[in-house]
């Protein structure tokens, strides 16, 4: 079970003045310790020369140090997914995650689903090694020790409670293994907020990893919360004209009004260290957000783009260097691309087409290939592609297996895969499949989940397409993750399977054989939305 609430020694305080709180936050770092490109791919040498790279822990360290110089009691939070996503995690696992997290000196951080990718055994060294509390109020674990429901910190004689949470979907989209129960987020956070309130804590922040929709639900339904700091959905929030290529998916902060009339801000800071969220909050003596011009209790708020105007902390750069030397063999060029191969969720995209094509080419006798959007972790830029780039795209050590499945069952899988799409196109990413060898037409209406496919066609050897037949068997190339219990229906429906090569090796071979890569959108997945 999670350890009980950890609090500071509390004395009876009578506070008559307002209280200003400076808060910084990041989420979904995913082992992106080095700076990234404008599209959050690998920052190439020519991009560095042009000043077109962003983020990285050395810039984070500079910004955090500068902010703490102005306010030494600045709160720094991380919304989870410390692990997984670059070659750094593939090669070194938890070691640089612990080192650089400790360098940044977080006040607290929540667990994310990918922090469980190597099970409890892979997570425990992180929980034991970091110098800040790791939080998840909705976790009951007999496997991982030391995860707390909340922590209370004293700032200028005010008590601030911080509650963590993580998506219950962790059971199906990661690998926590037995002995871990993920409870309802809203109920768990609400109960912990009540616990904190009962011992005199009246400023309460939730930090967690369940997505923008759940963040807003928490803000709406947990009456004791003052702020929600989120993660998981990689949501970019911004008020005004965005400073880079990301389109804002909502205001920063997003203000959520409770039934009582209280307003709770919700924030998130995209991903991969490209931005850091920066808030200045003002509370009255009762712990309620006050009402300045900029918003409800918010004196200032913005996600800060960590571009070339933010210098790199040289002490952190020296720490990076010792790892970079080990990684040099992975940085050999394996091919080139003439187009940017971007990862875009919930639709056909160039990166997905490339990877699915490589999987199809890995087997001589398969007709169709699938990979889930969640299995693709980074975009590829124009120019040279290195082994490091490929590992950043496919960091999970999956194999490209071939499986045999009946056509009727394949149609069921395809319907299941798109059931989470919403007509307004505002829903968070689902485990949408990128594919090769198939052409789909579908209509997404509010009430037609399970009946969205209008047409499903399979490409024939000559290049023509014909209808997918329900009574025919098909061979598919898929990533091994999708055959695991609970990850998709495929594992239960397939009638035969053959283990293949590592997905990383498959993609490297394909790039080497087909370079320079020129990928296009081909109409493989055609979706019409009816709001």
Q: Which role does the model predict for each range below?
A:
Residues 2-5, 153, 163, 476:
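Well-ordered beta-strand positions enriched in small/hydrophobic/aromatic, beta-favoring residues
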Residues 3-18:
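Cleavable N-terminal signal peptides of Sec/SRP-targeted secreted and luminal proteins
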Residues 16-300, 346, 350-361, 369, ...:
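Acidic, metal/ion-coordinating pockets
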Residues 1-2, 531:
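C-terminal end-of-chain detector
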Residues 6, 91, 390-391:
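Hydrophobic alpha-helical segments with strong N-terminal bias
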Residues 19-35, 39-65, 69, 184, ...:
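Catalytic centers of hydrolytic enzymes
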